[in-house]
Amino acid sequence: MPRKSSRLTFAVLATGAGVFSMLQSLIAPALPTVQHALHTSQSTATWVMTAYLLSASVFTPILGRVGDLVGKKRTLVAVLLAVLAGCLVAALAPNIGVLIIARVVQGIGGALFPLSFGIIRDEFDASRVPGSISNLSAVIAAGGGVGMVAAGPIVTALDYRWLFWFPVAIVAVTTLIAVRYVPESPSRADGRVNWLGAVLLSGWLVALLLPLSQAGTWGWGSVRVVGLFSAAVVLFAAWLLSEARSSSPLIDLKVMRLPSVWTTNTAALLFGAGMYAIWSFLPGFVQTPSSAGYGFGASVTASGLLMLPMLLAMFVSGVLSGRLEPVVGAKTLLTTGAALGAIACAILALWHDQQWQIALVAGIFGLGIGLAFASMANLIVGSVPPEQTGAATGMNANIRTIGGSIGAAVTSVLVTGRLQPSGLPYGSGYTHGFTLLAVLLLGAALAALMVPRRSGRGGGKTVGGSGSVLLKAEEEASVMAPGALN
């Protein structure tokens, strides 16, 4: 692809993925405003986040696979139209029920991540693939930061509905440009969609993530939580059996068993647990009145500004990782990113009584997120055959989301386990929560050390047709100890 065309294609992909990532975090700081404006309860308002999470978890791997089969551009345009429709309905929603449905439709946009990675792999010169994936990952990571920072000023100056009107305009233009300029992928997977596998995958994901997100309201020992967890186990086993027997599996389990894939996914699970929990709880910590013995009583806007170093660091480190990856390898970058996250949480557990400490921690964590996002994507893309790119990267994103749900749920138990007479958590709850996140992120760094070195350096060398060669080599290597290739 000519450089000018590839730049335009990248701009389209980055804009779409960035908007979706922004939508993921944009509404969280505004939930109290939404609750008041739509005259609903806090427990109902949280479904605005839960519905989005569940929808994205279901559609990301399924539509990633559909893109591999029927064409990534065609699927990309359809997904962009879904996001556009979801944002438009959300901006006009007259009640909380319609807003929740709109968020379900927006969640379809989770497939933009695997589709974008697949288009880059199919269309860009092999030498430019790792850097482009790193840059796209930087935009995705920064998009979440933009959401946290921008929500307060938008709601204060305008109205919460503008959190959706702005994306409507951006996605509409992006869709038109995508139709005109993004090329259709030349690489197609053989077979069909395993719809039974898709239904079972959707079933166990919902049965797992729903109780994780609602256990604080329902109670961990409630019939609903225990029943859904039990259903998740049964449906997961049925899904594995269906995929193993299918001639055209939704997720190729052979690919998932590759040493470079399962170790990267393990790191993604643990890193996601730490990252999403920090995004969920650090703003609340900062906004807590200082009368609680901690916190700064910051407004939504002020807390967003304290997160600004994280946003800037995420983008800078994500872009720089594209230049560092051919030199030090994606494995080293992933290990470093997870270690930086662990250091940030350890600092936060020990020192959090000054605002500059929060800003410092946010910056360190942002550096880690930028490095980790880019390296995880490069490791997966460089380890699987071209026709499996969408499904494999979609599953990696899903595993990161599952980790985030687990991390947020466990941290919530620690933070809210004991409450002051005012109803606010004790500071020790946050300290214990931040300590746990440091341990989880340290685990992510250790998992990253297990990634086979051959796929950790020069990820661009494995793209294109050589993915099947690497697949065969790693299938043979998988019978050895995971560390044998380090």
Name every feature range the model reports, one short phrase each:
Residues A82, G86-V89, G97-V105, W356-I364:
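Paired small-residue
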Residues S6-L31, T40-Q42, T46-A51, S137, ...:
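12-transmembrane solute porter fold
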Residues A37-H39, G71, L92-G97, L158-D159, ...:
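Helix-breaking motifs and short loop linkers at transmembrane-helix boundaries and internal kinks
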Residues V105-A138:
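Cytoplasmic helix-loop-helix junction between adjacent transmembrane helices
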